[in-house]
Amino acid sequence: MKLNRQKILDFFKKSQSKASVILSDKAKASNTIKDALGKAVTNKGDLEGVWSKLLLLFAVSKDYVNGDYTEIPKRSIIAILGGLVYFLSPIDVIPDFVPVLGFVDDIYILNLVYRQVVKDLEKYKVWKDAQIKFIGNIDGSTAS
């Protein structure tokens, strides 16, 4: 099956517009991330090829929405959230209920988003690793 990339990208642009609106409401943004994570966990086998990327997209979007990490351009967060909105939509270019092929377009979009924001994600990973180290040092020093 050949992907209609233009149709997928047009649908993704609509998802990004929705994401921009969702991002202005912290509760909606949090729920969108939570719902997308739930769908991802349920369909982990179909998403194996993008699983680690997807977890990183969830983490940075959650930390951004919670106000823990804001050193990422808003356009990057909108792209990430747009990818999650696209992923959440059961009726997109290839409906998710279509056996075997249902997630092909979702994986295409998630990979596209990842490539678009990879530099921002690398900075986020450095920050996140520092946070984990810092917390580990606090835990280690209080245990002594």
Please annotate each region the language model reported.
Residues 1-77, 115-144:
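Terminal, membrane-proximal amphipathic helices
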Residues 75-118, 124:
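Alpha-helical transmembrane segments that serve as single-pass membrane anchors or pore-forming helices
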